[in-house]
Amino acid sequence: MNPYQNNDEIVDVPENYDNNLNRYPYANDPNVAMQNTNYKDWMNGYEEINPSSITAILASIGILNRVIALTGVLGNTQEVISIIQDALGFIRNGTGNELLIHVEQLIQQTLATQYRSAATGAIYGISRSYDNYLMFFRQWERNRTRENGQQVESAFTTINTLCINALAPQASLSRRGFETLLLPNYAMAANFHLLLLRDAVLYRNQWLSNSISTANVNLNILRAAINEYITHCTRWYQDGLNRFDRSSRANMNEWRRFNAYRRDMTLSVLDFATVFPTYDPVLFPAATNVELTRVVYTDPIVMAGGRTAIPGFTRMENLVNSASRVSFLNQMNIYTSFYFRPHNIPRYYWSGNQNFLSNGTSNLYGYRSDGRTTFNVSNIDIFRVNMTTHIGGAFTDDYRGLHRAEFIGANTQNNQRTSLLYSVEIPSSHFRFENHTVFLPGESGLEPNERNYTHRLFQMMNEVSVNPNARGRVFLHAWTHRSLRRTNGLRSDQILQIPAVKTISNGGDRAVVLNYGENIMKLDNLTTGLSYKLTAVDSEASNTRFIVRVRYASMNNNKLNLVLNGAQIASLNVEHTVQRGGSLTDLQYGNFKYATFAGNFKMGSQSILGIFKEIPNIDFVLDKIELIPSNFMSSLEQTQNYNTYNQDTIYTHNQGYDTYDQNSSGMYHQSYNNYDQNMDTTYQPSYDNYNQNASGTYDDGYNPNASDSYDQSYTNNYSQNTNSMYDQGYYNNNYDQHSGCTCNQGYDNNYLK
């Protein structure tokens, strides 16, 4: 491509290059299963990391994606069991040791020999015992005899004891002084333990054939465990971050190691912790749409050195995107320039790129030039980038850069493999070429494809170093998880969980706060609010009534108003969650509470939902908004239990959990209970006047017809049979329920009491 002959090369509908992948000049065939070579490409020269440790990351990624799929079938017992068994298949005898070795290399610490065998064997032992438990559970499901129930209880007791012995404070997976080192193993074991405890809440009273329900005890053990495990994961993740030198003295190698720790611990620890709360079957009684908002970065491709400076820690960290509202890559402009020498031959290179995002913003990296190639990618999830770089020049020149890049992705409209190619001419006689492949592993193997990819390209950044007759560059790729969707699709058979940072609202009084990988929204001013576009995926969803629940943290009591298409439909008094002397800058799991608006509401086929904070000068953080089909839960007073129970650890818990003080009668403004909003496509003009400070409220790039058509694989392709999941024992007067609700909970028809 000559950039001066075609200044605006637009690629609107990319050609399918599925049969031409080998056109790219690989040193090795890219269609052959990638092992050590591609891992080194993925880590891009980070030699301190043992290539074999990729198997540990693959295990974590594989299990995580099964976990996200699992949240999409909560309520369907057989689907849940099948997914758990699939996840267990990722754990081999050496998985625990591989995870341990990997973190040892990242944080430069070694576990004492006498503790290693206990730690590395714990995960394998738990997985094998869990598999045995599932066998007995399925047998009991098919034939619910007392004898089969006793076998389930025996298997349950065995694995529960294994988990507690491994996860308890100072046990094999939380050894004092080595907590960070053991964290991926800890998170994996915690995940399986919580799934086990979830089964106890739903079924233990039945397989034991108890006449007196123990559901409350089992529920509170589960909730205490969720709190314990999330707190442990976030605390020791932060401890690991604090070990790195992040000063201006730190160099590129230190940043590489820091970034590898942040990325790999996100994939193997923090992502699990984000999903753990959905294992509470009272708060999440059915399929739930879970989306991860965090951004991770593959290792940089460094084309600097020689006569150009290699960026240090600070310059590299400046490339990393600060916390922001959710957005997606819609378009990328790539700019082409030419080197001063050698003369009379093509010598073009990638001089810069500009990323255009779905929220209307754009970011420029490097330099603009007249030569421009434009890729429209709003309907493409790029999951892999193949790059050819060069080093060389004439005489004493030291030019280092990029002249070829192939972006491979999935067309989200038809799920077909798609390739976009940037290529400019540069002579091999004067330059040495190197090939690089950048990606994050797929769901069931190292190499991602259009079916199993787990991450999509969010942004591509580059840092430039310039000297006379010398150029150096560093390329960095940012990725978001596939579970994050462009739209908020309402379904009649699923709880819609919307991360607060998916808001279409903007402004300085709406700050995004990074909270252990995931992003949350901080609201400051008097009428500050957040708005969200909702789209019903079908006519049934447009006629479904939804309960609205929020997860929040606040320094003081406040009042929230719920607004639908410009009309206020409910209000809610919320309690402070942070104790005196605390702050919203380092929020822990226990600092968040759930609160539910009274009533249920029909959203229509398309709508804009707003949450507005009423009381001024009170810092307030919103984490998630959840829309729950009203048929799943006729009452949500259990949410108040969740907020106020005694959160002792599961190892010293008080068996008197059965009594709660649920004096929640003063929590709700009881107006608007029967609001019916059936507005398909029209929004009331008065909506714009509700928040006087709102400007640029709507995202012009919104596509009302998108409706999540591109990625239903995580949550939507399962039978949602929720009729036989719940034990009425949750609600059999074991709580002090002063909420005034005496309604039939609707879960009491199919279980032994």
Swiss-Prot record:
Keywords in alphabetical order: Sporulation, Toxin, Virulence
S-S bonds: none
Entry comment on modification after translation: Has low mosquitocidal activity probably due to rapid proteolysis to inactive 56 kDa and 43 kDa proteins.
Biological process according to GO: sporulation resulting in formation of a cellular spore; symbiont-mediated killing of host cell
Molecular function terms from GO: signaling receptor binding; toxin activity
Region (Disordered): 680-721
Biased composition (Low complexity): 712-721
SUPFAM superfamilies the record matches: delta-Endotoxin (insectocide), middle domain, delta-Endotoxin (insectocide), N-terminal domain, Galactose-binding domain-like
Domain of life of the organism encoding this protein: Bacteria
Polar residues bias spans: 680-696
InterPro entries (UniProt xref): Galactose-bd-like_sf, Pest_crys, Pest_crys_dom-III, Pest_crys_dom_I, Pest_crys_N_sf, Pest_cryst_cen_dom_sf, Pest_cryst_dom_II
Keyword DNA damage found: no
Role according to the record: Promotes colloidosmotic lysis by binding to the midgut epithelial cells of mosquitos. Active against Aedes aegypti and Culex quinquefasciatus larvae.
Annotated family: Belongs to the delta endotoxin family.
Protein name: Pesticidal crystal protein Cry20Aa
Species, as recorded: Bacillus thuringiensis subsp. fukuokaensis
